[in-house]
Amino acid sequence: MAAATIVHDTSEAVELCPAYGLYLKPITKMTISVALPQLKQPGKSISNWEVMERLKGMVQNHQFSTLRISKSTMDFIRFEGEVENKSLVKSFLACLDGKTIKLSGFSDILKVRAAEFKIDFPTRHDWDSFFRDAKDMNETLPGERPDTIHLEGLPCKWFALKESGSEKPSEDVLVKVFEKFGEIRNVDIPMLDPYREEMTGRNFHTFSFGGHLNFEAYVQYREYMGFIQAMSALRGMKLMYKGEDGKAVACNIKVSFDSTKHLSDASIKKRQLERQKLQELEQQREEQKRREKEAEERQRAEERKQKELEELERERKREEKLRKREQKQRDRELRRNQKKLEKLQAEEQKQLQEKIKLEERKLLLAQRNLQSIRLIAELLSRAKAVKLREQEQKEEKLRLQQQEERRRLQEAELRRVEEEKERALGLQRKERELRERLLSILLSKKPDDSHTHDELGVAHADLLQPVLDILQTVSSGCVSATTLHPLGGQPPAGAPKESPAHPEADGAPKSVNGSVAEEAPCKEVQSSCRVVPEDGSPEKRCPGGVLSCIPDNNQQPKGIPACEQNVSRKDTRSEQDKCNREPSKGRGRATGDGLADRHKRERSRARRASSREDGRPRKERRPHKKHAYKDDSPRRRSTSPDHTRSRRSHSKDRHRRERSRERRGSASRKHSRHRRRSERSRSRSPSRHRSTWNR
């Protein structure tokens, strides 16, 4: 029978037995035939699935519950469709009957015919004519007249007792369900009789992989009216089961009248006799089994007795051979123990071998891991070495670039020093010309009388005072520079750590350019020029001192390497400005204002030199603070008693003002000036000293 289907609309269901959830639902089937065209092209076919989808598309408002193909030929395809309600059958027929379908790839149209499904159910005329025409039927006897219904395809689970937990159908449930139509005389479910298969030689139940799902049953009514009502109620119906959760399931059942006299008295007696025979046969088989079992037991008892006799005989023999058997037993135990020991030793040896293999495997894995780690470490070290090599190459490239840049700077510095040297030589030439001019001026004058000599001496002293100031400034800077060690180098081993406070007290030191020794004669000449004795003339005192104070520019420095001639550009320019500015200003200004301006310029140069220091520690500069040089700049000009009164008073007032200003600021200015001068002299190179003396 067909499988159960889900029912969504249960409005047309009729109650059969609500206690067990059984209802009757009308069968709403229809047959649909689609005429196929003649296939003219070979290899071309019509898809049944496409035709089915076109039929479903023709009914837009509703859907088929089921639509399946019942028959398919070259001329037509027949479908069986089922809908939810009986009322929908006519609307479906109106949508399908007489319509056409156009398939893709075919020029011909397909005509559709639809009609209501004809139910195969026996009518009253069928069973009346059957029982009337049958010769072996007696309508006066139950079972041989139309009073028995034959049901097929009933689900076992729907007719099983709920409290029993079994899925086998129950005759009591079957009676309660079908006694609605009338009093039931007898029922029969063949699958419940274990002897029925042996009696009839056929199977009365439907088999499936899930077990006994469906069964057949016979229901016999006492009255003919009960049979008529049952057949009328089951016509065109299918059985529906509604569970406790409200879900409904329906299945088709086959209903017919019994034409085999299954529940007639003769058939029942016949089945009972056959059952009795089968039971007797079964009893005989059981009796035969019991007798065979008893015979086997007797045989076993006799065998036991025989064995006992034999055992007694063996016991006698055993007593005779007890000593041998004991010996054999001991030997056997010894061999058994030996075998067990050998077996245990073999097992232990096997376990030991397995452990050794396992340890070797672990060792091999550890070695592989170690090799992997070493390989990774080697690869990483190589990668690191490559990285370091690349970094070193970059650093080497950068260093070469820096060296190239430094070389270019040094070349530029050398070019600048050469230019400075050329300029210094030019200045030396100018200085030599000036000296020659001064010498010619001094030598061209002849002394006439003492008064004229005094006037000329005063005039010459006034004229040469700026030149003497310049020479004293240059000589004092050179003396302070010679007391310090060279720039960037260490002082000589025999040099004292602290420079003397009074250079004139020491011997004549050897400077870099060899001209520092002339400082003492120069100072003596200055002192002689400042204090004029009564018996000496100015011409005899001043010219010789002036000429002795002028250094010789032809002396060249010895033993100074060319690498120490590099000085900073700003210091060189400041010295050049000093050389360019001081002579002109010294000639034009002999007053105290010019001297103060000169001191200010010296202090500004000392500050610039101290700012350019190379970060020398303060502790290295501290010892130089204790020794301050005396200011060698001239503070007084030599005067003559025969000079004019106005000039003498003017000069005295000017010198008095200068001395008062110098006394007020000498304590602080002298210490800072000498410290800056010593630091500036340390920062200068020997080439700087040489260029200063050359200027």
From Swiss-Prot:
Coiled-coil regions listed: none
CDD domains xref list: RRM_AKAP17A (cd12264)
Domain of life of the native organism: Eukaryota
PANTHER family listed in its UniProt record: A-KINASE ANCHOR PROTEIN 17A, B-LYMPHOCYTE ANTIGEN-RELATED
Entry comment, domain topic: RI-alpha binding site, predicted to form an amphipathic helix, could participate in protein-protein interactions with a complementary surface on the R-subunit dimer.
Subunit structure: Monomer. Component of the spliceosome. Interacts with ZRANB2 and SFRS1/ASF through its Arg/Ser-rich domain. Interacts with RI and RII subunits of PKA.
This protein's name: A-kinase anchor protein 17A
Gene designation: AKAP17A
